[in-house]
Amino acid sequence: MASKKTRDDVIAFFETLTARRFSDAGKALNELRGKNFGNQEFKDGYIMALEGLLLSSRTGDDRDFYNRAEFETQKALNNYKKEFRSFAKEDINSSYDTGFFQAWSDLIQYRSDNRKKS
């Protein structure tokens, strides 16, 4: 992540997405599109993942991972976090792939952190 402000905007996106406030999530996503992530290809992958999350959440299609994933247990969240971090760190990935999987990893981390708070 390029800056604390960018990180705050990502968190705002996750907050509004999980609260199913899709209009606000779309606005947060638009803010992120204007941010500098340091690497354009990484940013493109990251933003594409966020767009997919928003679309998947809006449609509620249970064929999508986001809509059928187990986000309620810490064990499941830890497993997802491990998998997505592993994908993001693979040397064979392009910067785009790394950005894509990093967005998912950040979402899982956000869900995990908020689960611990409640």
Residue spans of the language-model regions?
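Intrinsic-disorder/low-complexity detector
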Residues: 1-118
